[in-house]
Amino acid sequence: MEKKAKESLRRYKKAARHSATHSSSSDSTSDSDSGSSSYSSTDSEQGVGGVGVGVGVPGGAGGPGGSGSVHGHPHTHGHGHHPRSAERHHRKKKSSRRGGSSSGDEPSSSRRKRDKRDHVQKKLVAKRNHIKRKLKEARLKKRAAAALSGHVHRSLSPTTRAKLKKLAERKRLRAASKEQRERDKLRVVQRDRERDHHRLGSSRSPPSSSTTTTTKIRIHQDIVGKRQKSPGLGSGLGGGSSSSSSRMHHQLMSREKIIIQTRARGRTPSLERERERERERERERERERHDLSLRERDRRDRERERAEREAARDKERAEALARCQERQRERERLAREKLRRQEEEEGGKRGGPGRDLDLPPYGSRERSLDTVERERERERSGRHVRDKRELDPYEREQEYLEERHGHGLIDEMRRYRRRDLSPMPEHYAPRLRDPRELYSEEERERAYKRAYLDARYSSREREAWLEARELRERELQGREYRDLETEDTLYPDERERLIRDRERDRERERDRERERNIGPRGDFRPEWEREWEEEGAGGGPGGPSGTPGRPGGFVGGPKRGKPPAHAGGGPPSQQQHHSASEPDWDADERERERERERDRERERDREDRPDTGGGGAGGDRPSIKNEPAWLEHDQREKPRGWQQQSSNSGGDWRDNDDAPPAPSHPHPASPHHHVHPRGERGSGRGFRRGGHGHGDHGERPGYRSHPPPLMTLPVQPPGGYSRGFPHKRLPYGSGRDGAALGARDGGLPGSSTFLKKHTHAPLVSPTQTPLLNPLLNAAKPNAAAQASAVAAATTAVAAAKAAAQSAANATTNPGILAQVSKLNTVCIKQEDASEDSAGTPELGAQDSPTQSLNLNQSLSSEGNPVKQELIRTSAVEGELSEISDSDDDILNKTDKVRPKNELPTETEQEMDTNADEVKSEALHIVAGHPIKGEEGDEVLDFEEISDGELEEDARHKGIGDALGVDWQGLIAETRQQASDAQAAQQGVDRGTSAKQRWQPYRVLLDLGISFGMAGEGYARCVMEEARQQLLQEKEQGQQRELDGDEEPPAKIPSPLLDYREFLASQQQLEPLACVQMGLRSAAVERQRLVGNVCGPGSRALSARQDLRLRRQLCGLPARECEFPRSVPIVGEGLRNLAMQMFQRRLLDVK
């Protein structure tokens, strides 16, 4: 044995170099170097290594004599060399320790000895590894040979196998428990780390030293020939001791792979490390507390600085406000001095009321107003000493308020001042009850911040609206709220009319100023103001007027907030060069001069016109309520030169009894060219679009050129078409417009309770004027007769207007005409369909004969049946005689202007004679059945209307034609009838609820049922049952209607044939659901075609409709199907073959 061991050692020397490098790599995967699995200690390794020389090889040779000792049977045979080798090993260790301690000073001989011992030790270790490898190879060869020879059972005895199995099981359980402990330890460490992480709140990753890595070691080892650390290793040599029998027997690995998890360097943190970590956490918390305190201190510092800045800013604001107030007081003082010097220069001569209206327009202090009054009294009485009562006028506030209610002059002065320099309307309170509420401190400060704003425009609109509300409240005191009509509110078109009256007076003053060559503030005017007159010459009254509308060529005109551009040498805008709170003294001088001229003009008017029936602008009409004095100073609609009338009319053509003259703008080159000034199309800021009729602008009343036929171009009705005020969109206005006309022209005191409310713009349409003007001419010699005739005519027109919506088609459909004549006592409510102008006739769509027809229907229904035919025939003959047979003449026709001196026709004379009896009835009709408006008694929005909205409205306009036919109304009626008939034909009658429509029997009748899917008998039974249920439901509905349990649904013409009955009848029931549906759709189409031919409201039978009917009745397709000629015609035989195949397929499906 020793020889073989020596041989193996010699073999090892040859491969020493290789084993020195290879053993650490290849054998590390085995159990030799793992240290924790194979061998328990260095002593055992050394001992086994020493013994292995003499023991291991016989097992490798596989001799029969060494079978018992090789495989580790627990025979306690002594081992002779083992104690000596152990002793030698301990000595070696002691000498190596001793040599390690005194390595510096020991002699070289001992160092050589130590080196030699180390070299021998290394050789022994290498030899041990080599022998292990050789043993493994031998085992593998032996196992392979045994497997080939089939004698495996000879290698191990049953008891050996049982013991090995038990040891392997114990080893496996030990490894499993160790792995479980490792896992538990890892889980505990991870939990501690997470707890620390959450407690610190830091996002730092845990230190890498505490991480645990799991190393997987794969060990392929076999049990056969495995050494055990037991005393039985040297049993083959005989003899031995049982001293090491108490050692733990380490069973090496089994055949299968076992994964051992070890901790790579990361151990459980020690106590010192835990303390260090805790100290680190404490330092972190301290730093966080310090940062929080720093942040809090910074925040407090910032808040203190902000408060100091706010206090400094408030102080600066207060100082600036005090400075501004001081400057204002200085200005007021200078203004009073200037007024006093001017009056001294005039020799004490007092001016007209214009002097008070031209006070410095600063409305924040009423004390200045009161002081000026007292200065005038002081100058009149000659005293020049101020007392304390004079210096503090707020003691006289109650007296001032009483005087304001009683004294019209102070009232007008306050209105003028509040209008001129009030802030923007959105900063207003809804009502101004006290003079001190005019300017709050906040608004005064805002005025200094917004010096660039021109405050006149929006404040003027606001003031007009406030005055209108005051007028309404004074008029309607003591009346029931429900008695008020919806038109009682003063809308922007009324304001526009009032403001235009005022503007005409201003324009006259400016013209007189220009005649005297009084050039205010230099002759320079900006280019847009100088050229505006010429550019706007052909554009109607949108040009030089004060509305911010565009003239003809001035496309980029201002929309909002732009000061008015003045004509001629008039003054530029009053507040272009100073802030909203500073007055313009030159403008006030000019205003004073104009007021004096205005007073002289009024005096001349009173002398020239002793009769005040017309109620001129300067006449004695008692309408300071209706047209307050501040309206004379608005700079809005400046009229053209052709609107300046002679002085006997007071400068307003509407006060005359004559029709206005023709406009100065030239006729357009084409009759399709529309002459629509910008102001009429809807200029103005916040005003209703086109709130003034053509007559207001002096346009020739009969002249209205039409657009090309059936085009949807915008045609503005004279009553205006405004989205902002939809309930004002009646055709040509209704009773209120006529009443307003009468109130303006007649000014009757007797009818003032009814007519005073309607201060709307006189919506004079081109169709109205030929009807009403001869009435005025006929009654002109006698003022009383004129007033009664005008009132009667206007109220009659108001009553007749209510029927104008459905009577617009009177000339085309006599049946509708007969129906309309019955509508004398009920005013037609304007439904929501008027949003699409369905019932709103356009300008060209309702000519004067149609209006006279409507009027005469309302007259004749109240007791003039004999005259009705005469009136109707004469009107229709006159209408037809004006139209020639030429299409061009029809399309290019314009309304004829009736000359002023033309005698009234017999129609109007009859109207005149019947005017008195009609008047009260018409008043009763209009008052008893007010026209339904939409919600809202007061409109508080002053939102301007943009061009985009105008174009959008234009797209919604109806279709107007030269023949006066309301095509839009006809189309709407036809659509309604068609939808009703279609709903009835489809069985969806208006009394049917959604729940009823989704009943199973209705669904089955609508969809059909397939015989192939359900079976023929069952399908017929189901359809018949559904049909019976439908009939039963109809009978129940009729019974409920008879009993009066529910309100009867809208009457719809019953279909000629119920398609459900047709579908479910036993003879017509087809086997396929698609065929049933096809039959139903064919029946519905046929019924629709036939039902539209006759019946109420049906159209005349056209050629197209006739052809469709014939195609339907003959079974032809609805449209002509044109096949290309290249398609071959299918032969009869081929067609029959295809049909047979189709029927066979159907039979197969069944």
UniProtKB/Swiss-Prot annotation:
Disruption phenotype: Female-specific lethality, associated with sexual transformation phenotypes. Hemizygous males are sterile. Sexual transformation phenotypes resemble other N6-methyladenosine (m6A) factors, such as sexual transformations, Sxl splicing defect, held-out wings, flightless flies and reduction of m6A levels. Associated component of the WMM complex, a complex that mediates N6-methyladenosine (m6A) methylation of mRNAs, a modification that plays a role in the efficiency of mRNA splicing and is required for sex determination. In the WMM complex, acts as a key regulator of m6A methylation by bridging fl(2)d to the RNA-binding component nito. Required for sex determination and dosage compensation via Sxl alternative splicing: m6A methylation acts as a key regulator of Sxl pre-mRNA and promotes female-specific alternative splicing of Sxl, which determines female physiognomy. Residues 660-669 have a biased composition (Pro residues). Its main location: nucleus. Residues 1-10, 176-199, 270-414, 428-444, 492-529, 589-611, 630-640, 693-702, 890-903 have a biased composition (Basic and acidic residues). Residues 21-44, 98-107, 202-215, 851-861 have a biased composition (Low complexity). It is found in: Nucleus. Residues 11-20, 72-97, 110-144, 162-175 have a biased composition (Basic residues). This is Fl(2)d-associated complex component. Residues 47-69, 537-558 have a biased composition (Gly residues). The lineage of its organism: Eukaryota, Metazoa, Ecdysozoa, Arthropoda, Hexapoda. Was named Xiong after the Chinese character for maleness. It comes from Drosophila melanogaster (Fruit fly). The keyword Ion transport does not apply. InterPro entries: Flacc. Widely expressed during embryogenesis but shows enrichment in the neuroectoderm. GO terms for biological process: cell differentiation; mRNA modification; mRNA processing; regulation of alternative mRNA splicing, via spliceosome; RNA splicing; sex determination; sex differentiation. Belongs to the ZC3H13 family. Residues 122-147, 269-347 form a coiled coil.
